[in-house]
Amino acid sequence: MRNIKTYLSTVPVLTTLWFGSLAGLLIEINRLFPDALLFPFFSF
């Protein structure tokens, strides 16, 4: 039972940190390279 409580208290923290860092990374990429979705389609 102790392992389950540790798991349930660790996973939300790790997923929050993961999604927070992923959102920050995507925001910084969009800040440095705006409209990056258009680059592969209009590269000619």
From Swiss-Prot:
It is a single-pass membrane protein. It comes from the Eukaryota. Keywords: Chloroplast, Membrane, Photosynthesis, Photosystem I, Plastid, Thylakoid, Transmembrane, Transmembrane helix. The chain crosses the membrane at residues 7-27. GO terms for cellular component: chloroplast thylakoid membrane; photosystem I. Its main location: plastid. The keyword Plastid applies. GO terms for biological process: photosynthesis. It is found in: Plastid, Chloroplast thylakoid membrane. The keyword Transferase does not apply. May help in the organization of the PsaE and PsaF subunits. PANTHER family: PHOTOSYSTEM I REACTION CENTER SUBUNIT IX, PTHR36082. Belongs to the PsaJ family. This is Photosystem I reaction center subunit IX. The gene is psaJ.
